[in-house]
Design a protein with these regions (language model features):
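Conserved G/P- and acidic residue-centered "switch" motifs that form tight phosphate/ATP-binding loops
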Residues: 28, 42
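Catalytic core of pol beta-like nucleotidyltransferases
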Residues: 1-25, 31-37, 48-99
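Short hydrophobic/aromatic beta-strand micro-patches
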Residues: 44-46
Length: 99
């Protein structure tokens, strides 16, 4: 994880519990040296079985943007391009796992 990105673990855990997320991970430039003040944060979420946020997904993205004080691009494994999915899943750094 890039030192310029601070992930407040307690707030992320609260966010995930409220939104029925079983796993949240960061991927992309936030893990590399090219991450800058202008970079957004790519976040991958997996929901608990039977939990689908619908249009609330965009509200969640905005909430995470406010929480991290950066633009957030929220993704789910099924929305990732099949051409990049395996690479993203293998590089992603998990920040929350439902206990």
């Amino acid at each position: 994880m890039n030192k310029n990105l601070i992930i407040p673990k307690d707030k992320i855990a609260d966010f995930c519990e409220r939104h029925h997320i079983r796993r949240l991970a960061v991927f992309g430039s936030a893990l590399r040296a090219d991450f800058s003040a202008q970079s957004d944060v790519d976040i991958l979420v997996e929901f608990q079985p039977g939990s689908e946020p619908g249009f609330g997904f965009f509200d969640m993205q905005n909430e995470l943007s406010n929480l991290l004080a950066r633009n957030v691009e929220l993704h789910t494994p099924n929305f990732l391009s099949r051409y990049f999915r395996d690479a993203i899943l293998s590089e992603a750094e998990v920040q929350y796992v439902q206990s």
